[in-house]
Design a protein with these regions (language model features):
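Short acidic/glycine-rich loops and adjacent helix/strand connectors
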Residues: 1-125
Length: 125
């Protein structure tokens, strides 16, 4: 598929993420980044099987932007909607195939750090 990133430089001068600015930036960037991902993957919306969105944890404003967009898109193209735990997704991304590689299995050590929380996980199955 595709891996696209939208960087929010506006937070640099504050030394951390400002929730209101983050949600506004999400609103501005969500359509362009989805168009870029579809283009990079050389697919169209009709080619996808489902719409996944982050249900949390995360900043409320940014989560609302994501779930609202995902629900609208899901309804408009008649595809199922899947809610995903943000932190679990980072750990489980270990199993995703990327170009030229195969995912490795368990056991492995996972580490997530977000908003002042850190988790070190031993994944055995």
């Amino acid at each position: 598929m595709a891996n696209c990133v939208a960087t929010q430089q506006i937070h640099q001068k504050y030394g951390g993420v400002v929730p209101e600015l983050a949600s506004r930036a999400h609103q501005e960037q969500i359509v362009p980044i989805i168009k870029e991902a579809l283009s990079d993957a050389k697919i169209e919306l009709k080619d996808i099987d489902a719409i996944a969105f982050t249900r949390g944890p995360g900043l409320m404003g940014s989560l609302v932007v994501g779930v609202s967009f995902a629900k609208a898109l899901s309804l408009s193209i008649k595809k199922p909607l899947i809610d995903v735990n943000h932190m679990k997704a980072h750990v489980l991304a270990h199993f995703r195939e990327t170009a030229g590689t195969e995912p490795t299995g368990c056991p492995f050590l996972g580490c997530t750090v977000s908003a002042g929380q850190a988790h070190l996980l031993e994944v055995t199955r």
